[in-house]
């Protein structure tokens, strides 16, 4: 006769083989599908990296081209003429004058309003920040570029 231990050994062996067979029916196709998706992830990552590198190259070249055009435009513009202020200089007070009260220092008298005497007037140049930056770019370029 067959002992009880041998009988249960063959029962467990049979169950293990049957369950392993049915699980392999699911695992092997799913493993193949995951392999296909992994190939897709790698290939799309490669394509994404290549398209980014190409776009970066296009951007750098376009930026360099636009900078050259801007330098040429800066060389062709006439320097801005400094205009005299409309008010005579005698009415303007220097900023460094310590006798002018500052509105920020008048915390002891909170009820006092800011008057014309409290405001510091400075002559303002007619040039804008863009015009100054173009002149700076033209000076740095050393007049290398000429439009033809």
Curated annotation (Swiss-Prot):
Disulfide bonds: none
Biological processes, Gene Ontology terms: sporulation resulting in formation of a cellular spore
Highest taxon in the source lineage: Eukaryota
Assigned GO CC terms: membrane
Extracellular membrane side: 29
Function of the molecule: Involved in spore wall assembly.
Protein name stated in the entry: Outer spore wall protein 5
Gene of this entry: OSW5
